[in-house]
């Protein structure tokens, strides 16, 4: 599995999009500068952690002065490649896949689902929210032609490994997998897992 760019530890890499989102909100509110202690309250992350996270990227602020919002937006935008459009494919147009396509990252200008794939003949050939739905066996031709390297897999666990193999054969190098099954993939393939059931069970552990 690939490591994040800029030699960022995985925990830090997961927090960078959070920082970026909040700096964008600060910019919208007309705030030009913020200190780490103030930012810590907004993002619910300790200020010491924020300063340590930022140190992995560079000297982003000055002691006693804080962080310039516009400068941090530029830095995080470059790290996240926020100025580059990333086209994605969705594999599996069930309830979850359909919801993702309907939303299609409407709050992010640089993320866009441009095609979807399913095994259901009744869905193949249809268009959902402007996104065409293809048959799974069309992966090998559609993905390379569209220049897509990122896919979101919403297929059931029993189909996730086979789906991943087909995606990789088609040129996909990054996969967001909603099935809990750990995929066996080459080292250069980047896989992230999002198990909604596990997240909810973890949440309930803290319920009084």
Curated annotation (Swiss-Prot):
<keyword id="KW-0678">Repressor</keyword>
<keyword id="KW-0963">Cytoplasm</keyword>
<dbReference type="GO" id="GO:0005737">
    <property type="term" value="C:cytoplasm"/>
</dbReference>
<protein>
    <recommendedName>
        <fullName>Redox-sensing transcriptional repressor Rex</fullName>
    </recommendedName>
</protein>
<dbReference type="Pfam" id="PF02629">
    <property type="entry name" value="CoA_binding"/>
</dbReference>
<dbReference type="InterPro" id="IPR003781">
    <property type="entry name" value="CoA-bd"/>
</dbReference>
<keyword id="KW-0805">Transcription regulation</keyword>
<comment type="subunit">
    <text>Homodimer.</text>
</comment>
<dbReference type="GO" id="GO:0051775">
    <property type="term" value="P:response to redox state"/>
</dbReference>
<comment type="similarity">
    <text>Belongs to the transcriptional regulatory Rex family.</text>
</comment>
<dbReference type="GO" id="GO:0045892">
    <property type="term" value="P:negative regulation of DNA-templated transcription"/>
</dbReference>
<keyword id="KW-0238">DNA-binding</keyword>
<dbReference type="GO" id="GO:0003700">
    <property type="term" value="F:DNA-binding transcription factor activity"/>
</dbReference>
<dbReference type="InterPro" id="IPR036291">
    <property type="entry name" value="NAD(P)-bd_dom_sf"/>
</dbReference>
<comment type="function">
    <text>Modulates transcription in response to changes in cellular NADH/NAD(+) redox state.</text>
</comment>
<keyword id="KW-0520">NAD</keyword>
<dbReference type="InterPro" id="IPR022876">
    <property type="entry name" value="Tscrpt_rep_Rex"/>
</dbReference>
<feature type="DNA-binding region" description="H-T-H motif">
    <location>
        <begin position="18"/>
        <end position="57"/>
    </location>
</feature>
<dbReference type="InterPro" id="IPR036388">
    <property type="entry name" value="WH-like_DNA-bd_sf"/>
</dbReference>
<feature type="binding site">
    <location>
        <begin position="92"/>
        <end position="97"/>
    </location>
    <ligand>
        <name>NAD(+)</name>
    </ligand>
</feature>
<keyword id="KW-0804">Transcription</keyword>
<dbReference type="Pfam" id="PF06971">
    <property type="entry name" value="Put_DNA-bind_N"/>
</dbReference>
<dbReference type="InterPro" id="IPR036390">
    <property type="entry name" value="WH_DNA-bd_sf"/>
</dbReference>
<dbReference type="GO" id="GO:0003677">
    <property type="term" value="F:DNA binding"/>
</dbReference>
<dbReference type="InterPro" id="IPR009718">
    <property type="entry name" value="Rex_DNA-bd_C_dom"/>
</dbReference>
């Amino acid at each position: 599995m690939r490591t994040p760019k800029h030699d960022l530890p995985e925990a830090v890499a997961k927090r960078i999009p959070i920082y970026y989102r909040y700096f964008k909100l600060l910019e919208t509110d007309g705030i030009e500068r913020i200190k780490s202690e103030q930012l810590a309250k907004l993002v619910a992350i300790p200020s010491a952690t924020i300063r340590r996270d930022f140190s992995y990227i560079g000297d982003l602020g000055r002691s006693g002065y804080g962080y310039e919002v516009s400068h941090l937006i530029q830095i995080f935008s470059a790290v996240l490649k926020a100025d580059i459009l990333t086209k994605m494919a969705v594999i599996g147009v069930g309830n979850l896949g359909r919801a993702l396509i309907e939303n299609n990252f409407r709050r992010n200008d640089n993320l866009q689902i441009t095609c979807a794939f399913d095994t259901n003949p009744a869905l193949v050939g249809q268009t959902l929210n402007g996104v065409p739905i293809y048959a799974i066996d069309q992966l090998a031709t559609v993905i390379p032609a569209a220049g897509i390297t990122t896919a979101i897999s919403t297929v059931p666990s029993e189909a996730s490994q086979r789906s991943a193999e087909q995606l990789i054969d088609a040129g996909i190098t990054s996969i967001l997998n909603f099935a809990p099954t750990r995929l066996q993939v080459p080292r250069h393939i980047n896989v992230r897992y999002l198990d909604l059931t596990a997240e909810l069970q973890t949440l309930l552990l803290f319920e009084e």
